[in-house]
Structure formats: structure tokens, C-alpha cells
Amino acid sequence: SERHARIGNLFAHFDLAQVSKAKASELDSEKRHLLAIAAALSFEPSAIVADEPSKGLDEIGAAHVAKALFSYNKQVIFATHDTDMIRRPEYAIDRVLVLDEHAVAFDGAPAEAVAFYEDLIRRKYEAAKR
């Protein structure tokens, strides 16, 4: 069927073919993240929404997941504390919202957003020390 072909293509794209018969619980964190992205894309969404896509991954795993997330020509909306991911030009992130206390505190370009976020964290840390 068309859906099986699409899933096969996604598994090939995300280098999951060799683990296609494994249970998700048997996969390492990186493969589970990639499987979640592939599963979402199997429904042909117009956008991908991800919460902390690199959480719990080492630097290499986080890079693989981020590359996968941004490699499928879909709009990506995600929440993260991973400022390295936001800074990477190859992901072509064009807009970043920084939230503070459940409200938008900054809306703009990645580099400025990272600087704002880092300053915000620094100010909160300094205030907590007092």
C-alpha cells in the first residue's frame, strides 16, 4: 500500500530500516526520537511539532535528531532549551519565541533570541542567589 511505501521511505531516510522489527522499548534514545519523527511524518502533516526533540541525547545524538527534524522540508515548531540547535545555520530557523513565566518575552531572529535567553537565565540565576 501507499502508506507502507511511505513508511519504508521514512525508515530509510532516518536510517531506521535495520531496527524496523525491534520494539520501540528496545531502541536507544536517539532511535526512539527518530522513530517518533518518522511516525509523525507518516501522516503527511503540513508541520511537525516537537517538544524538547534533543532532550536526553548526547551531542551526537542531538545533532542526528535535529538534522532529521529539519531534513524533510516541513515547517518545524518546537520547544527547546538547546541553544546550540537554535544557533545552527543549516537548520534555517527564522523565528524564535522565548517564553518566560508562560508569556512571550522575546520574538525574533535566532541569534538575538539566544542572547536574550542566556541573559534572562543569567538574571534569574543572579536573583535567586540573593
What are these regions (language model features)?
Residues 37:
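Hydrophobic anchor residue at the start of the ABC signature
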Residues 48-52:
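Catalytic Walker B motif of ABC-type/P-loop ATPase nucleotide-binding domains
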Residues 55-67:
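Conserved D-loop/post-Walker B switch-helix segment of ABC ATPase nucleotide-binding domains
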Residues 2-19:
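Conserved ABC ATPase "signature" region
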Residues 103-126:
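Conserved beta-strand-loop-alpha-helix hinge in the C-terminal portion
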Residues 23-27:
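Conserved ABC ATPase signature
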Residues 79-83:
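H-loop/switch region of ABC-family ATPase nucleotide-binding domains
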